[in-house]
Structure formats: structure tokens, C-alpha cells
Swiss-Prot record:
The modification Phosphothreonine is found at T831, T865. Expressed in brain (at protein level). Residues 663-704, 785-807, 822-899, 1134-1158, 1196-1218, 1238-1265, 1282-1312 are annotated as: Disordered. The gene is Lrrc7. Residues 687-700, 859-871 have a biased composition (Low complexity). Residues 663-676, 872-882, 1134-1144, 1243-1263 have a biased composition (Basic and acidic residues). LRR repeats lie at residues 23-44, 47-68, 70-91, 93-114, 116-137, 139-161, 162-183, 185-206, 208-229, 231-253, 254-275, 277-298, 300-321, 323-344, 346-367, 369-391, 392-413. Belongs to the LAP (LRR and PDZ) protein family. It comes from Mus musculus (Mouse). The keyword Cytoplasm applies. This is Leucine-rich repeat-containing protein 7.
Length: 1490
């Protein structure tokens, strides 16, 4: 009858059914593209009981609708409602109300009149609080408020005594009202992705609770009170910072599913064996060294996952698990299996990948039901003959490169025992460790490797591919998690298909080479990069005393690293790629690094580091002396990478590349670095909720800290690196949580202690606050946040927490991009400092989050690590000023002069660029860059002679290529804040530092500049660098030797000024997805390394190259050209920018372009497409800026919206009971048009920043495609609305934290990723700061483009058009900082390789409206063009309206009248657009197909 009634409802005029007309009670108008409620609905107001208006574009509900007194169910999800009319009180019979996925900001107070309401679904709305009247809905049984902006619940919330289901995922809750103990009927409570630092006390009083989600929070302990929940069946505590589980958990007698993945557990309580009903136990991605024997009591256990731990044996009692069906023990250190394993006869899937198995017990043949067995990456020489009994075996994986699931086995006689064994051509297995690396290094083909890597990079950056990569990274985690290098190789080989067909072999080679490389410098670097990335991902616990180890690396090399490597979770495809790049860099760089480092012998470096960084990392931060910090930016970076940063550098081995002072040292260093990386990455990884990438990001970010924070940053970085995993105390990381590094920001006090290698937890607590740590996307911001954290604990923690969540993916690549040779050196220098950390890499490493967590974060970690490293190394650098001193002596970042410098420092680029030491000819290139540009790699490692236009760079001299990158300049600007700062720094600082590798070196330079305006810059300047000028085809025209001195002085002067400020800004920038991910093009890196012929030009070139560098990294095939272009562009741009601009504006521009690191996607995209993107920086920059907002950090903590929840969660544990939460698909559906710009003109502007989530027309798309994290980014994008809200709130928090940082914050023009822009509500909170922040974002853009709207962009607080430095955007930017992480990730996901993003200025005259609709934004419903993009997109244009000939669907709005829409809330964007008077000047990004 219902169908008939629906039909009748549509055929009202038909008299045949007139008799039944009055009986019509249900009308369904779902998916009808309605813009208003159909009038025929009112014809049935007396009888209508159910009305469905799902997925339309309805913006308001007519009053007449509320005359339908009989209405019982009103369903209007996925529309454009901005408010719920008060007349809803007249629907007294309403029982179900669904307003999810709209723009509703609050419930009307008189909702209390709807006494019959039993179900309310209001998820994915920017609701910041519930009215008091809400608690009078006493019949409410189900309440869904996922992905809103709730910071607290009403005190009398306990009045809703009939509540059975309460879902509050992805909000900003820190506590629960005590009255909730009255909710005696509550069965399901979802508090995932919030900001709880401890389990709410009231929880143990809700006795009837059956399902509890507390994942993605900041819990450090699982208290025994949880054992009071006798009815609890499902408990998800994954992605927290839990170090201990209380014995009393055994009280949960009914518990069936226990998810403890991605925490910091070192042991499980014996009482776990009392959970007799347990069917699923997931403890993967922790730091377990053993399992309790009581595990055998879990007789009903069906699924057991203990992958990515440090297990050296399985208890024999495992044989009692007779119900076990799935057993995963990947990435541990098992030398053998217990014979009792054969008693698990029901196991169908068993994965033992990446262990140290040398033989299998005969009893394995008793597992008759075994269908899938993964033995790859072990050391098996053969298989027992009993394998012939496994009749159901369908897949036997013996190698990551295996072409078929089942390869025939032959019977042979064991050479010693003469027993029959099974073997085939894949035996004996070659360990991925040292042996493999060594064996492969001999046959390593740099050219082939480069080509394959480029291909991989391209795939990684493609939108869809990226998605797959991300997924594969997550999926492959179990498979590809191996020793750090193993991971690199294996991850690559395992996921080569995902990355690219040829990826596997190159990776394997890379890994092998890395292993070999530990002996040769270049190899060690490669190995180290790979290992480092892996380690970071793995977050090895013990940060080996890398500082001491940079020299010690050789001793550490190989074995230890191998262990660490195994520990790391499999990197995402991108991570793998990055690792490969790192390996390449290591291989190629070693000679350079060696030479350079030869100048500074390992011992010397260590001594230097030790002397200068006696404090170890903490001291550096304490020292804040720009000079010291900058003196050894490269070394410090290296050390940081190796040690503290290493934790996060794993994904960015190139960045971490230990370009050894000697090849040997390099080799050893690579090993040590790997270990360190592992350790640090572990910490950071653990800390970052999501993934090793995050951890990496944190590390990298930390490192990025520049200037005054530099010393602090060093400490913070170090600590944060360790603390990434270790510092659970970091509470606000809920959002940042995914980014361990971010989350675990070390408090300013702690930062100085870094040299002491604070316990991971100690180190992480504050440093991880760095917003940049959290996300790849917002990596720059994160790091900046970290630095800010050093200066301002509040800010740092917030910033860090936000980015941690969503940015890792992007960051990872970016991080990898720039590792200056000096960085490597810095790693060496850092080694002495790192020495302090436990010699066992595992001890301090907090495990990085599992691949599922978002490996992309790791890249950022890597980058962060370098940042940290450079800081300590800065001291060293003082000794070798020639390299670092350069223009960045003051510590100005290449991109951001003031706040930006710190940010830059945090960036990989900064790390790379900071080591112009003549002794260190090594040019570290971030892995991404390497990957993208063979040239970069080549440059990084003299070994690598790439066929690309860029020639190898001499160790002694850096060749800077002046690439015509005017477009790239914007691209470079986009590329990353890190890069930007270089660019800006360059001109002001003379770009002397430019001698360092552009991406990292610039950051390093920034750091140096910030650290002090000492002679070191001059020393660096003294370094002769070669600048290559590229023709437009990007072919080197010739090398010009240039000295860095010119650059050095200007940077120092300005940078010193911004030393402290920059650190804060840098963090944000680091956070920015684009900024972070915009790795300086290789050339940029080169340009750092080598003074340009024209300092200014060089500076520009460096900055430019950095911008392209991101592109470089992103796009393997057009690496050279993009790099060249970027370089050229940057070279010219800095000249164009006035010093004020450079610092405020230019640096800002760097920041913007750094944000454009996010926007780097744009340049990258252009690079991919071979076009320059300078003209479009604003959009991408805006996006990048949003990406780098620390505010995002908070958001990142809760990266997943209710819908993306499952996707983002780790593995199955993520699955949650069915709920009303909208599905991903639903979210995507909603994406098309969040708001109608015509109606919400004003709102659009603000929200666009937040909602600009939709794919940027070009750069964004590229960016989105870029991230290996694409899949997660997509989820985040979908969550973008939530994120928007969260980011905005976070941004507010960041604002608070970073306001003191505002001087640098203004700089922050951290690239505000679209996601970084806080939602409307949050923007309101942020107030002018936020707007300023947005403005600064645009400003960065603008700087690049020098668009007329820059001032407007910044107009809220300050007109960014004016010098950004004075602008107090920082706080607002800081506010947005948290979002950068997400932005970064999303950016990654969104970057499209299909078209070139073009930016246009459009002027529209209202008549009366604007004539177009928008969707996306932080709190928007997403957009149909680039779901992972949180930007504001045009979805509809009225044919004959004011915008008919100017806009077209798919255009991404970057700015409106100077307001940055990059990470703006949808609602704010709409309000902004509506608020504009007659003329609206838009800066849009349009993706043009090739």
C-alpha cells in the first residue's frame, strides 16, 4: 500500500484515485534535486505521516510544512539547511527527525515541544552545543550527533533516561556530564575521535553498556574501572596512547571484541585470559615484547592480530586456541614458531610476514584448514615436507614479488639432515635486512630505479591510485611491515602493484641497496631513508643514540636497523615510495653526504653535536640560539632525523638521508639512522593515531622548527619524535592523535630535555603538539605547532594534535622530499645528541600507527624528523657555518620568514636546506622529491646519476638549477611552506643557505637564521654551490658556481627577528598538507645546497624549486621539469618579493606557497602536466594554508567522520555496530552541493575555507591524488565537514595556544588547507584571528600571485596583502593549524594528475545574488568533484545569472574579496559570500584537462 500511496501522491490530479487521496500518509521525494519542498506536499497535511526529502538541495523548510500535525517522521538529510525553524515545535507527533549532513548550527530551544521524538539523527552538522530544552525530550532513545562541534554536553543530559544509542564520534568532547550515570538503558556509546585524555568516570556507572568506542582519543591508561561494565560486549580503545591495561579488565566477563590496536602497550595483563567469551583480540601496532601464557585460555578466540610488535616468541599455549581462524603475527621478530601451533586446526588464514623465521615446525602440516599462508620476508631455507598435507592451501606467499598465489614446490633432501623438504626457486629466502641490501647495491641501477620511482610517484600522486595506495598501504601493512628497509623494499614490493608494476623490483633493490648501502655511504643513506621511513613508521621504541650514532651508524648499521625495520608497520604505497626514494637518496647522496660529512668527520660531527647539543635535543631548543641551531641545521636535522626525527623520518629517508660525512659513516649512519628513525618514528608513530606517517610527520615537523624555537624545536623535535609514540599525555591530540608525532608534542620545558632523550611519553607529550606532526597534509603546520609548542605549550599541543590526524599521508611524501645533505649531516651531528636515547632503538620508539592509521603521516614524520635533526645539527652547523649560515643564518625558513621560518624548519625542506656545509656536499632531498625527480635523487646522492636534466650535485658544491619556474614558483609556493620560506628567505637571507638542498636546506636555513644570525650562515655562504639554469624544457643550461654568502646575511637579519615567531608559524605551515607535502623540488633542494649565481635569483630559485619540489615529489615523471620550473620560479619570485614581503609577505608567500605546499599540489600538478602553476597559487596556497593550520591538528585527532569512521579505523576493529551514522557513500552523495552560493554568498567565503574540501580545480586535485593517503583523505574529506568544524574549533584552540605566537603566526599563513579553515562556528570563535588566518592563507597565495585580494584574504584581522609578518594571522592560522593535517591528507587525496589546476580572478556583480551554488568546505557535505578536497567548490551556475560566463561547476573558490576559502567552513563561506555587497572578486581554481 505504501508504494501505491507514493504513486498516488505523485498523481494527485488523477481522479481515478481520488477516493484514496486523503489516505496518503507517506511521500518520498528523495534524490529529486529539489531546491524547495514541493507544494503538493501541503495537500496532504492532515494525513501525511512520513515525508522523505533526502539528498536534495533544500535550503529552508517552509512554515506550511509544520502544519502537518500528523507527521511522525521527517527525513531531510543531505540537504542545504542552515537552520531548523522554531516552528518545528508544532510537530507534536514527530517521532523521528533526520537532519544529518546539513548546515544546521543549532537546535531551536523549543525543540522540547516535540515530546514524542524518539530518534534524532543530526550527524555532520556544525552543531556546537545542545540547547537546554533538548534534555526535555524524555522519550529520546537514539541520538546521533557524530561529526559535529560539540565541546560539552548539557549538565542535565542524564535526563534522557530512555537513551539506548548515543553516538558522539568526531566532536571535541573532553568530559561527560556526571548526570549520565542515569542513562541506565544506554547500550551503545560512541565517543571515538574526541579529545578524552582519560576514561570518563561516569562510564563505569552505565551498567547496561554493551558497546563502547573510545578510539582515536588521548587515553594513556585503560583503568580497572572498565571492569565494572559486566555487560560490555564490544570495546574499541584503538589509536590512543594506552601504555598499560589494568588487571581488572577481566571484569568485563561478556566481552567478545577487544580492540587495542595502535597504542603503546608493552605487555598485556595475565588477567586477559579470563575473558572467556573473547572472540576478537587485536593488539597490533603496539610495543609488545611477549604475550602472556594465559592467552591460551581464550578458547573461543577466532581472530588474533598481534602484528607490528616486538615479539620474539609466541607462547606455546597458543596451541589451545582451537577456535582460532585468523592469526596475524606480521612484522615481529619471531625466529621460530612453537610446535603447538599445529593444534590450531581451524586456522584458515595465517600471516607471518616480516619475521626472522628460519624454519617451520613439521606440525604446521596439521593445520588442515589453512587456506592462506604468508611467509614472505623471512629467512626460510625450505618448507617442511608436511606442507603436502595442506590440501586446502590456496595461497602461499613466499615473496612480496610473487606473481602467483601458489608456486609449485619440489621435494628435495635437506643437505644436512637428509630429510625430505619442500623448496622452489624462491628459497632460500633473502632477508630484507643487510644481506639483501648489500646484495642489491651492487646491481643497483640508479637510472632504472629513478624511472621506476617516478612511475611510482606518479601513481602515488594520482587521485585514484593514491587511494589505492593508501588502502594498499593499510592492507599491506601486515604484509609489508618489515624491517625498516624491508618495509621500504617489501612495502614497495608488496604494494608495487598498488603503486606500480615496476615499483616492486626497484623497491626491493632499494631496500637491498640500503642494506648494502649501510656500508657505502650512498647505500646507507638509501638504506637509512628506507629504514628511517620504515623505522618511523614502525616507530621503533629505542631511538638509538643517533646523534652519537650518526658516526656510530656504521656500528648500528644493518642488524639493529633490521630489527627496527621489522618493527615498523608497512608503509603506505606512498610511504614505500618515499622509503624507496630515501633509499635512492641515501644511495645517491652518500657520496655527497660522505664528502660533505668528510669535511666534518663523523666523530667531529658527533663531537660538534655533543658539544653544541650537550643538552641533546632538549638543549637545542633551550639554546634557541639561531646561530647554533642554524649552524648545524643539516647536521641537527640529520641527527634529529636519525634520532628524534628519525622516529618520524622513516618515511622520509631521503630527508633523513644520512649523507654521511664519509660513505662509511653514511652507511653506518643509515643503519643507525634507521634505528633511530625506528625509535623516533616509533614514538611519533605511536603518538600519531593514524600512522607511522604521522609519527614521521611529527618528527619532521619538529625538525622544521626554526629560529628561537630552533633550539627548543630541537628539543621539542627530539622529544616529540620520541614522544610521538611516547607522549600519550598529549591530550588535545584527539584530532592530532592520528599523528603520533603531533600528538606527542613535548612541552616547552620538555623540549629542552630532548638531548636527554626523554622517555617517549615525556618527549611526546608536548612536542607532539606540533600541528605539523599530525598530518602529512598539514605537516608544515604541525611542525610549526611543535615549535610553537616550544614557545607556547598550549599552542604546540593543539597544533600538533590537529595535524596528527589527517595530514600524515601527504606529509610523508613531502617529508621525504627534502632532506638536505646537511640534513643528513645534521643527522650525524645529531647522533651525539641522540646518543642519549636508549641504545636500543626499540626502547624509545613508540610504535608508529599502523598503516591503517594513516601511514602518510609517517612521511611527515620523516620530514619532521629531519627538522628536529637539523635543529640539533644547527649547533654543529655553527661549526660548519658555510653550509647552513647562508641566507638562513637567522633561522628564517625559506618559505616563511617569521613564523614561517620555523615552520619551514620543521619541514623536510628546511631540514634539507639547512646544511650548506661545504664539507657536506650532500644535498638531502625529501623522499617525495626524490621520488618525483630523479634529478633530486641524483643530486642527493652523487651515486645516482640520473638521466634527468639535473646533473648530480657535487658533494663539495651544490649545483643549483635555475629553473624557469615562474609558474612553478607558485607551484613551489604551493609546494610547501617549507619551500616557501626558502624562497622568501632566500631573497631576504640572501639564500646563502640555499646551498643546502632546497627543500630541507631551506628549512634548515630558516632554522639557522632563526637560531642566530651568526657566522655559520656566512660559513655556509662560503660554500660554493653550482646553480644550474634550466631552459624551459628543464634541461640544465649550465652550472654556475655561486656562494651562499649573499643569501645568508639577509635571511639572518630578518629571520633572527622571527626566530621564535617562525617556530610557531612553521609548525602550522608544516602542518599544512600542501606546505608539508609540497616538497621542495629537487632543484630547490639543490638550490639550497648551492648558492645561486644570483643570490636573489638563487633564493627565488630555491624557493621556486621547493615549490616544484613538492610537485617533483608528487610527480615522478616530470620531476626534472617541475623542479626546474619551480626553481626558476622561486629564483625569480624572491626577487620579485620585497624584503617585507619575503618576511611577512614573501615569506608569507612562502608560507602561502608553503601552504601551497598543499598548494604544492598545484605546482606538482602542473609539473605533472608540465605546466607552471604560478598563476594559481592562491587556490592551492589557500588550500595549503588551510592544510597547515594547527587548528586542523585538533581536528586531525578525529579525522574520521561518523561515516568515514569505518574506513579510518584500524582494520576490522573499526567496524562498529550498525548505527544511524551516515555511510561514506552517503557522505559522498552529500558532497555535491553543500550550499547555494547565490543564497549564502557570505557564508560561502568562510566555509569555503573549511569546505573547500571539494577538489581544488587543479592543484588541489593534484594534491588529492598525490597522497598515498588518498583513501583516508577521501574519508577525511567526507569527514571534512566534521573536520571543518573540528578544525575550526581546533583552530580556535590553536589560536589560543598560538596567539602568543602570533608574530610568527601571522606568518602562518601556514598554508591553510581547505580542511584547515575552521568551520563557521569555529571561525567565529577564532574571530578576527581566524579570518586573519584565512587571509594569511590567501596572502601566501597572493604573495605568489601577488593577487589583488591578498589584503582581503587577510582582511579579517589584518590585510595580508600588507606585510604578512605584522599580520596577526598566526593565532587564527594557528587556529586552523589543526586542520592542516587533515588538509594535507586530503590534499594528497585530492591532487589530480589529470588536469592542470589553473587559478583565475573573477569579478561577479550581484544581481541580486551571485547566481551559483557551492558545496564543500570544512563543515560542508563535501563536493562531487573531489571528495577528498575540503575546499569550496562551485556546483551549479545559473545559466543566465551573474556568474554564468565566469564560473563553471567544479571551480574551486580559493578566495573571495580577499577572504581565503581554502579551509573554510561551508557555512562561513556561504555567509561570507552573502555578506558581500555588490561586487565579489573571486580567486578560483579550475582544473583544465590537458
Amino acid at each position: 500500500m505504501t508504494t501505491k500511496r507514493k504513486l498516488i501522491g505523485r498523481l494527485v490530479p488523477c481522479r481515478c484515485f481520488r477516493g484514496e487521496e486523503e489516505i496518503i500518509s507517506v511521500l518520498d521525494y528523495s534524490h529529486c534535486s529539489l531546491q524547495q519542498v514541493p507544494k503538493e506536499v501541503f495537500n496532504f497535511e492532515r494525513t501525511l505521516e512520513e515525508l522523505y526529502l533526502d539528498a536534495n538541495q533544500i535550503e529552508e523548510l517552509p512554515k506550511q510544512l509544520f502544519n502537518c500535525q500528523a507527521l511522525r517522521k521527517l527525513s531531510i538529510p543531505d540537504n542545504d539547511l542552515s537552520s531548523l525553524p522554531t516552528s518545528i515545535a508544532s510537530l507534536v507527533n514527530l517521532k523521528e527527525l533526520d537532519i544529518s549532513k546539513n548546515g544546521v548550527q543549532e537546535f531551536p530551544e523549543n525543540i522540547k515541544c516535540c515530546k514524542c521524538l524518539t530518534i534524532i539523527e543530526a550527524s555532520v552538522n556544525p552543531i556546537s552545543k545542545l540547547p537546554d530544552g533538548f534534555t526535555q525530550l524524555l522519550n529520546l532513545t537514539q541520538l546521533y550527533l557524530n561529526d559535529a562541534f560539540l565541546e560539552f554536553l548539557p549538565a542535565n543530559f542524564g535526563r534522557l533516561v530512555k537513551l539506548r544509542i548515543l553516538e558522539l564520534r568526531e566532536n571535541h568532547l573532553k568530559t561527560l556530564p556526571k548526570s549520565m550515570h542515569k542513562l541506565a538503558q544506554l547500550e551503545r556509546l560512541d565517543l571515538g575521535n574526541n579529545e578524552f585524555s582519560e576514561l570518563p568516570e561516569v562510564l563505569d556507572q552505565i551498567q547496561n553498556l554493551r558497546e563502547l568506542w573510545m578510539d582515536n582519543n588521548a587515553l594513556q591508561v585503560l583503568p580497572g574501572s572498565i571492569g565494572k561494565l559486566k555487560m560490555l560486549v564490544y570495546l574499541d580503545m584503538s589509536k590512543n596512547r594506552i601504555e598499560t591495561v589494568d588487571m581488572d579488565i577481566s571484569g568485563c566477563e561478556a566481552l567478545e571484541d577487544l580492540l587495542l590496536s595502535s597504542n603503546m602497550l608493552q605487555q598485556l595483563p595475565d588477567s586477559i585470559g579470563l575473558l572467556k567469551k573473547l572472540t576478537t583480540l587485536k593488539v597490533d601496532d603496539n610495543q609488545l615484547t611477549m604475550l602472556p601464557n594465559t592467552i591460551g585460555n581464550l578458547s573461543l578466540l577466532e581472530e588474533f592480530d598481534c602484528s607490528c610488535n616486538e615479539l620474539e616468541s609466541l607462547p606455546p599455549t597458543i596451541g589451545y586456541l582451537h577456535s582460532l581462524r585468523t592469526l596475524a603475527v606480521d612484522e615481529n621478530f619471531l625466529p621460530e614458531l612453537p610446535r603447538e601451533i599445529g593444534s590450531c586446526k581451524n586456522v584458515t588464514v595465517m600471516s607471518l610476514r616480516s619475521n626472522k623465521l628460519e624454519f617451520l615446525p613439521e606440525e604446521i602440516g596439521q593445520m588442515q584448514r589453512l587456506r592462506v599462508l604468508n611467509l614472505s620476508d623471512n629467512r626460510l631455507k625450505n618448507l617442511p615436507f608436511s606442507f603436502t598435507k595442506l590440501k586446502e592451501l590456496a595461497a602461499l606467499w613466499l615473496s612480496d614479488n610473487q606473481s602467483k598465489a601458489l608456486i609449485p614446490l619440489q621435494t628435495e633432501a635437506h643437505p644436512e639432515t637428509k630429510q625430505r623438504v619442500l623448496t622452489n626457486y624462491m628459497f632460500p629466502q633473502q632477508p630484507r635486512g643487510d644481506e639483501d641490501f648489500q646484495s642489491d647495491s651492487d646491481s643497483f641501477n640508479p637510472t632504472l630505479w629513478e624511472e621506476q620511482r617516478q612511475q611510482r610517484m606518479t601513481v602515488a600522486f594520482e587521485f585514484e591510485d593514491k587511494k589505492e595506495d593508501d588502502e594498499s598501504a593499510g592492507k599491506v601493512k601486515a604484509l609489508s611491515c618489515q624491517a625498516p628497509w624491508d618495509r621500504g623494499q617489501r612495502g614497495i614490493t608488496l604494494q608495487p602493484a598498488r603503486l606500480s608494476g615496476d615499483c616492486c623490483t626497484p623497491w626491493a633493490r632499494c631496500d637491498q641497496q640500503i642494506q648494502d648501502m649501510p656500508v657505502p655511504q650512498s647505500d646507507p643513506q638509501l638504506a637509512w631513508g628506507c629504514i628511517s621511513g620504515l623505522q618511523q613508521e614502525r616507530s621503533m621504541c629505542a631511538p638509538l643514540p643517533v646523534a652519537a650514532q650518526s658516526t656510530t651508524l656504521p656500528s648500528l648499521s644493518g642488524r639493529q636497523v633490521e630489527i627496527n625495520l621489522k618493527r615498523y608497520p608497512t608503509p603506505y604505497p606512498e610511504d614505500l615510495k618515499n622509503m624507496v626514494k630515501s633509499v635512492q637518496n641515501l644511495v645517491g647522496k652518500p657520496s655527497h653526504g660522505v664528502r660533505v660529512e668528510n669535511s666534518n668527520p663523523t666523530a667531529n660531527t658527533e663531537q660538534t653535536v655533543k658539544e653544541k647539543f650537550e643538552h641533546k635535543w632538549p638543549v637545542a631548543p633551550k639554546e634557541i640560539t639561531v646561530e647554533d641551531s642554524f649552524v648545524h641545521p643539516a647536521n641537527e636535522m640529520r641527527i634529529g632525523e636519525l634520532h628524534p626525527s628519525l622516529a618520524e623520518t622513516p618515511l622520509y629517508p631521503p630527508k633523513l638521508v644520512l649523507l654521511g660525512k664519509d660513505k662509511k659513516e653514511s652507511t653506518d649512519e643509515s643503519e643507525v639512522d634507521k634505528t633511530h628513525c625506528l625509535n623516533n618514528s616509533v614514538s611519533s608513530g605511536t603518538y600519531s593515531d593514524y600512522s607511522p606517517s604521522q609519527a614521521s610527520s611529527a618528527s619532521s615537523n619538529t625538525r622544521m622548527k626554526v629560529g628561537s624555537l630552533q633550539a627548543t624545536a630541537k628539543d621539542a623535535v627530539h622529544n616529540s619524535l620520541w614522544g610521538n609514540r611516547i607522549a600519550p599525555p598529549f591530550p588535545q591530540p584527539l584530532d592530532a592523535k592520528p599523528l603520533l608525532s603531533q600528538r606527542e608534542a613535548v612541552p616547552p620545558g620538555n623540549i629542552p630535555q630532548r638531548p636527554d632523550r626523554l622517555p617517549m611519553s615525556d618527549a611526546f607529550p608536548d612536542n607532539w603538539t606540533d600541528g605539523s606532526h599530525y598530518d602529512n597534509t598539514g605537516f608544515v603546520s604541525e611542525e610549526a605547532a611543535g615549535e610553537n609548542a616550544n614557545n607556547n605549550p598550549l599552542l604546540s599541543s593543539k597544533a600538533r594534535s590537529v595535524p596528527a590526524h589527517g595530514r600524515r599521508p601527504l606529509i610523508r611524501q613531502e617529508r621525504i622530499v627534502g632532506v638536505p645533505l646537511e640534513l643528513e649531516q645534521s643527522t650525524h651531528r645529531h647522533t651525539p645528541e641522540t646518543e642519549v636515547p636508549p641504545s636500543n632503538p626499540w626502547q624509545n620508539w613508540t610504535r608508529t600507527p599502523s598503516p591503517f592509521e594513516d601511514r602518510t603521516a609517517f612521511p611527515s614524520k620523516l620530514e619532521t624528523t629531519p627538522t628536529t635533526s637539523p635543529l640539533p645539527e644547527r649547533k654543529d652547523h655553527m661549526k660548519e657555518p658555510t653550509e647552513t649560515p647562508g641566507p638562513f643564518s637567522p633561522g628564517v625558513p625559506w618559505e616563511y620568514h617569521d613564523p614561517t621560518p620555523n615552520r619551514s624548519l620543521g619541514n623536510v625542506f628546511s631540514q634539507i636546506h639547512c646544511r650548506p656545509d661545504s664539507s657536506k656536499g650532500v644535498i638531502a632531498i625529501s623522499k617525495s622529491t626524490e621520488r618525483l625527480s630523479p634529478l633530486m635523487k641524483d643530486i642527493k646522492s652523487n651515486k645516482f646519476k640520473k638521466s634527468q636534466s639535473i646533473d648530480e650535485i657535487d658533494v663539495g658544491t651544490y649545483k643549483v638549477y635555475n629553473i624557469p619556474l615562474e609558474n612553478y614558483a607558485s607551484g613551489s609556493d604551493h609546494l610547501g611552506s617549507h619551500e616557501r620560506p626558502d624562497k622568501f628567505l632566500g631573497p631576504e637571507h640572501g639564500m646563502s643557505s640555499m646551498s643546502r638542498s632546497q627543500s630541507v636546506p631551506m628549512l634548515d636555513d630558516e632554522m639557522l637564521m632563526y637560531g642566530s644570525s651568526k657566522g655559520p650562515p656566512q660559513q655556509k655562504a662560503s660554500m660554493t654551490k653550482k646553480v644550474y639554469q634550466f631552459d624551459q624544457s628543464f634541461n640544465p643550461q649550465g652550472a654556475v658556481e655561486v656562494k651562499a654568502e649573499k643569501r645568508i646575511p639577509p635571511p639572518f637579519a630578518h629571520n633572527s627577528e622571527y626566530v621564535q615567531q617562525p617556530s610557531k608559524n612553521i609548525a602550522k605551515d608544516l602542518v599544512s598538507p600542501r606546505a608539508y607535502r609540497g616538497y621542495p623540488p629537487m632543484e630547490q633542494m639543490f638550490s639550497f645546497s648551492q648558492p645561486s649565481v644570483n643570490e636573489d635569483a638563487m633564493v627565488n630559485a630555491q624557493f621556486a624549486s621547493q615549490g616544484p619540489r613538492a610537485g617533483f615529489l608528487r610527480r615522478a615523471d616530470s620531476l626534472a621539469s617541475s623542479t626546474e620550473m619551480a626553481m626558476f620560479r622561486r629564483v625569480s619570485e624572491p626577487h620579485e618579493l620585497p624584503p617585507g614581503d619575503r618576511y611577512g609577505r614573501a615569506t608569507y608567500r612562502g608560507g602561502l606557497e608553503g601552504q601551497s605546499s598543499i598548494s604544492m599540489t598545484d605546482p606538482q600538478f602542473l609539473k605533472r602536466n608540465g605546466r607552471y602553476e604560478d598563476e594559481h597559487p592562491s587556490y592551492q596556497e589557500v588550500k595549503a594554508q588551510a592544510g597547515s593550520f594547527p587548528a586542523k591538528n585538533l581536528t586531525q585527532r578525529r579525522p574520521l567522520s561518523a561515516r568515514s569512521y569505518s574506513t579510518e579505523s584500524y582494520g576490522a576493529s573499526q567496524t562498529r555496530p550498525v548505527s544511524a551514522r551516515p555511510t561514506m557513500a552517503a557522505l559522498l552523495e552529500k558532497i555535491p552541493s553543500d550550499y547555494n552560493l547565490g543564497n549564502y554568498g557570505d557564508k560561502t567565503s568562510d566555509n569555503s575555507d573549511i569546505k573547500t574540501r571539494p577538489t581544488p580545480v587543479k592543484g588541489e586535485e593534484s594534491c588529492g591524488k598525490m597522497p598515498a593517503d588518498w583513501r583516508q583523505q577521501l574519508l577525511r574529506h567526507i569527514e571534512a565537514r566534521r573536520l571543518d568544524r573540528t578544525p575550526s574549533q581546533q583552530s580556535n584552540i590553536l589560536d589560543n595556544g598560538q596567539e602568543d605566537v602570533s608574530p610568527s603566526g601571522q606568518w602562518n599563513p601556514y598554508p591553510l588547507g581547505r580542511r584547515d579553515v575552521p568551520p563557521d562556528t569555529i571561525t567565529k570563535k577564532a574571530g578576527s584571528h581566524i579570518q586573519t588566518l584565512m587571509g594569511s592563507q590567501s596572502l601566501q597565495h597572493r604573495s605568489r600571485e601577488q593577487q589583488p585580494y591578498e589584503g582581503n584574504i587577510n582582511k579579517v584581522t589584518i590585510q595580508q596583502f600588507q606585510s604578512p609578518l605584522p599580520i596577526q594571522i598566526p593565532s587564527s592560522q594557528a587556529t586552523r593549524g589543526p586542520q592542516p593535517g587533515r588538509c594535507l591528507i586530503q590534499t594528497k587525496g585530492q591532487r589530480s594528475m589529470d588536469g592542470y589546476p589553473e587559478q583565475f580572478c573573477v569579478r561577479i556583480e550581484k544581481n541580486p545574488g551571485l547566481g551559483f551554488s557551492i558545496s564543500g568546505g570544512i563543515s560542508g557535505q563535501g563536493n562531487p568533484f573531489k571528495p577528498s578536497d575540503k575546499g569550496i567548490f562551485v556546483t551549479r551556475v545559473q545559466p543566465d545569472g551573474p556568474a554564468s560566463n565566469l564560473l563553471q561547476p567544479g571551480d574551486k573558490i580559493l578566495q573571495a574579496n580577499g577572504h581565503s576559502f581554502v579551509h573554510m567552513e561551508h557555512e562561513k563561506a556561504v555567509l561570507l559570500l552573502k555578506s558581500f555587497q555588490n561586487t565579489v572578486d573571486l580567486v578560483i581554481q579550475r582544473e583544465l584537462t590537458v
